[in-house]
Amino acid sequence: MERIKELRDLMSQSRTREILTRTTVDHMAIIKKYTSGRQEKNPALRMKWMMAMKYPITADKRIIETIPERNEQGQTLWSRTSDAGSDRVMVSPLAVTWWNRNGPTASTVHYPKVYRTYFEKVERLKHGTFGPVHFRNHVKIRRRVDINPGHADLSAKEAQDVIMEVVFPNEVGARILTSESQLMITKEKKEELQECKISPLMVAYMLERELVRKTRFLPVAGGTSSVYIEVLHLTQGACWEQLYTPGGEVRNDDVGQSLIIAARSIVRRATVSADPLASLLEMCHSTQIGGVRMVDILRQNPTEEQAVDICKAAMGLRISSSFSFGGFTFKRTSGSSTKKEEEVLTGNLQTLKIRVHEGYEEFTMVGKRATAILRKATRRLVQLIVSGRDEQSIAEAIIVAMVFSQEDCMIKAVRGDLNFVNRANQRLNPMHQLLRHFQKDAKILFQNWGIEPIDNVMGMIGVLPDLTPSTEMSMRGVRISKMGVDEYSSTERVVVSIDRFLRVRDQQGNVLLSPEEVSETQGTEKLTITYSSSMMWEVNGPESVLVNTYQWIIRNWETVKIQWSQDPTMLYNKMEFEPFQSLVPKAARGQYSGFVRTLFQQMRDVLGTFDTVQIIKLLPFAAAPPKQSRMQFSSLTVNVRGSGMRILIRGNSPVFNYNKGTKRLTVLGKDAGALNEDPDEGTTGVESAVLRGFLILGREDRRYGPALSINELSSLAKGEKANVLIGQGDVVLVMKRKRDSSILTDSQTATKRIRMAIN
């Protein structure tokens, strides 16, 4: 108090005021504090002090030519004294105003291109609709979300290379643009930004926004795609939320959504094939999403979802260390356990072998619609605190936690036998057996669990076996909370291994993911997914299988034709014919196959009966294991459009229609491609034309290796002999002429010789 009084007295004296306002500061410590280092110690004060001066800005001397000395009001815009210590001119802030009003105007054509993300945001907000505001206490949980809509998915390093190449193409430094997306973006941006006068640094910043995914760990209730996150401050507060529908979609959200759908389809399909891992990789490598290879997206996109993570693990990429069970992501937050095999008896006296986790552990469980904290000991649930959107979601979380706890009363609650199978008809492991059982009906589980009286704890209430909330009693150890559990925030990724059956394990051998965890939910992808693998033809139904099978034969006709005559068994075993078998009535498969194979053998034996169209038409039927029978067929049945449709052995049908005039094939009315050669063109035409320069020596001679296709003949050296397959499926021996002079007569001789060789 004394000090304050003393200060007041001092301030009342005019000399004190003068010392403080007029005299210079000459205490070395103070001068040091404010002048050492290049960092401004008090930017706000510095700005005020500078702007109070008449000429606070310095500019290049050229400014004198472009700005008048005085403005319309006669105020001086720049000083004739140059800046101390440099040859720059001192300029008044009024000069900036003059420049903004009267200075040269540049082309604005590049602004929407450089500031694309801002322009697009304005459009989305313009077309978005804001609904009513609701005041309520909502459960927000922190999730890792994407905060800049409309970006590509490049890694920071890839983006840096693209930005350097676009903005500073002449700078030194090794830049390697490898991925397809890098090259595409670089080309597009270079074209867009020709003659661009916007400062390169600004362009670089804006490009970074466009190319790299930026994520933040934010409290969210509701939509997590980037078009919702950009308006988070408008749609949810501490105790209110406002409904909002975005006025547009952005590619990065669509990529994530479509990636999940593609990955789920691929994992589901791979599970039922003979070698799930090999099939999964083949499909990932041959699939495109929105025109970009799926493997490129998997490498760059941080989307975390069970099927996506299985695909990433198969490609040898790192994934999150959390594990999945019952559609919930579990992350162990404390404790540890050891695993031990144990046999237990269900309520139906069925023996199950389960891997028991011995020890005390705590987990967070995060699902789409519910989150929970789980504390468990060996085969005992200690505490479960759940929060969720509705009763159904809360029930799902409770069931998963009860099964995960491996408690005896849960196993004893099983009624009936457990015999759930996966898509490949293999029995599920015991933990998933139990899970499926109680997901179907959890009534007995909840009733057998036991209830207990509860204390009154802020923000927590009990839940009874019929899922009604209560403040007095609750299922043992289970409580409902208003607060959500935050998603696991770390972006740490770990090395994992994957086995043939797509089970993903961490380096300690814990199973993180398996195909049982992949959701069965079907959605409609936002971007076009193109599955080139024959394994995925059936995704779009029987018609797609039919059309794709025939398109594949036509596309690969040159090699198919050679295999047909030389190594038919290998051809029949091709995986491309697998999906087709599901269209052929089960009872008829073997007989059709036997019949077609016999027919083909006759074509090979009886020269001149080769028939391109018929081979293409019947080939898929020959792929099934054949049954020997004397049966003859005039048509073969395929199950499409909900009923059996016929393919005629001789002639066209709605299923398989070949137009001789246009040489095009239509399957179920869809174009399946053009055939290279007309089966009826006799021996002249194509062969004789192509065989110019070759001498036909006679029938096939096996010593000269397998038959080449006509296109492969060009690689022969002069005088070299080879077997060649000609249009009728016949193989002849030819020799490349040593001289070129007689080429003209070759085509006539060839025609005669082929006839002789065949007859």
UniProtKB/Swiss-Prot annotation:
Subcellular location, principal: virion
Membrane-spanning ranges: none
Coiled coil (UniProt feature): none
InterPro entries hit by this protein: Flu_PB2_2nd, Flu_PB2_6th, Flu_PB2_C, Flu_PB2_CAP-bd, Flu_PB2_middle, Flu_PB2_N, INV_PB2, PB2_helical
Subcellular location as annotated: Virion; Host nucleus; Host mitochondrion
Motif Nuclear localization signal: positions: 736-739
Sites marked Mammalian adaptation: 627
GO CC annotations on file: host cell mitochondrion; host cell nucleus; virion component
GO biological process: 7-methylguanosine mRNA capping; cap snatching; DNA-templated transcription; symbiont-mediated suppression of host cytoplasmic pattern recognition receptor signaling pathway via inhibition of MAVS activity; symbiont-mediated suppression of host gene expression; symbiont-mediated suppression of host mRNA transcription via inhibition of RNA polymerase II activity; viral RNA genome replication
GO molecular function, one term: RNA-directed RNA polymerase activity
Keywords from the named record: Cap snatching, Eukaryotic host gene expression shutoff by virus, Eukaryotic host transcription shutoff by virus, Host gene expression shutoff by virus, Host mitochondrion, Host nucleus, Host-virus interaction, Inhibition of host innate immune response by virus, Inhibition of host MAVS by virus, Inhibition of host RLR pathway by virus, Inhibition of host RNA polymerase II by virus, mRNA capping, mRNA processing, Viral immunoevasion, Viral transcription, Virion
Residues in the signal sequence: none
Functional note: Plays an essential role in transcription initiation and cap-stealing mechanism, in which cellular capped pre-mRNAs are used to generate primers for viral transcription. Recognizes and binds the 7-methylguanosine-containing cap of the target pre-RNA which is subsequently cleaved after 10-13 nucleotides by the viral protein PA. Plays a role in the initiation of the viral genome replication and modulates the activity of the ribonucleoprotein (RNP) complex.
Quaternary structure and partners: Influenza RNA polymerase is composed of three subunits: PB1, PB2 and PA. Interacts (via N-terminus) with PB1 (via C-terminus). Interacts with nucleoprotein NP (via N-terminus). Interacts (via N-terminus) with host MAVS (via N-terminus); this interaction inhibits host innate immune response.
Membership in a protein family: Belongs to the influenza viruses PB2 family.
HAMAP family listed in its UniProt record: INV_PB2
Name this protein carries in UniProt: Polymerase basic protein 2
